[in-house]
């Protein structure tokens, strides 16, 4: 087994009828989240279906991005004792429902709306088919 996969943090399964994780964090993504939390408080992710920055996972202070029935909660991470939700637009989920998502981080400029932007880092999604 690939050691990078073994060290990923899986989100708890939350969709009705499912018992598997749909989303994970790489160790690097978790480390960045732990650095961002003291600055911004509790955090959340939202993945929209837009183009450009809209196709990247956006990290917000929890509650700053308002979710609705147009969004799906894909998973909840336990990041050292604090919950971190990962949401996706329902429309995007229809395209990606057969996909496992891994949140990773790379050096580079992301969206100015996502809290990691001033760090010179950006979150991105790596995906693979479920199953």
Where are these regions (language model features)?
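Domain-level signature for proteins that mediate thiol-based redox and metal-cofactor handling
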Residues: 1-131
